[in-house]
A protein has these predicted regions:
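Short secondary-structure capping/junction motifs at helix and strand boundaries
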Residues: 2-4, 75-76, 135
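Alpha-helical context
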Residues: 11, 57-59, 136
């Protein structure tokens, strides 16, 4: 019985997206799902600091999906997930460089050790086939990214976060990695929801 609102937007420079907001139901206090796909002309070199092809910069394309979930039940944590891909175009309009980014994290109101351990174990299991150190690195990235300096603490109990990732031989493999990460997030979060929804 939730209400779902849809907001479509466009960007003058090129592209647009859709935002869905879910609320006023039995489960969500508020939930937002954002889709975006944009394109444009040459980027400033500052935006290309970590790519190899600064000199080949005739345009760009970027796409992303983000999710933020605020359940009504305080025993179920807030969660956040986003995936994104960025491509640089050459003078013929072909993608000549690309990278991916994303991650997910968990913010409990009433922390349960079982949920936190399971959350991190699922992330570690997902990442192990891609590299022995990825979980450690991505988990540290998440902790640093969501650090709140003036409070000397971090937001929530962590997760994984990465940016400018190009550890794949093709863009298709990079996209497959993002898809697998999104599925891991959904499955891991649903485990917690099922465990706590009647608390």
């Amino acid at each position: 019985n939730s209400k779902i609102s849809e907001d479509n937007w466009t960007r003058a420079e090129g592209g647009g997206g859709t935002t869905y907001v879910i609320g006023d139901g039995d489960f969500f206090d508020n939930c937002a799902v954002n889709f975006s796909s944009i394109y444009g002309k040459k980027l400033p070199n500052a935006a290309l600091a970590k790519t190899l092809n600064k000199e080949v910069n005739f345009g760009y394309q970027a796409a992303g999906i983000s999710v933020i979930s605020h359940p009504k039940n305080p025993h179920i944590p807030t969660s956040h997930m986003n995936i994104r891909i960025f491509g640089i175009l050459d003078k013929d309009g072909l993608m000549c460089d690309w990278w991916i980014g994303g991650g997910y994290d968990l913010t409990p109101f009433l922390p349960y050790k079982e949920d936190i351990i399971g959350w991190h174990n699922d992330a570690k299991k997902f990442l192990e086939p891609y590299g022995a150190n990825l979980y450690k690195d991505f988990s540290e990235n998440c902790n640093n990214y969501f650090n709140i300096p003036h409070r000397n603490e971090r937001r929530g109990v962590g997760g994984i976060f990465f940016d400018n990732l190009k550890n794949f031989s093709s863009i298709d493999l990079g996209i497959s990695f993002l898809q697998a990460m999104a599925v891991t997030y959904i499955e891991s979060y649903i485990k917690i929801i099922k465990r706590r929804r009647n608390s």
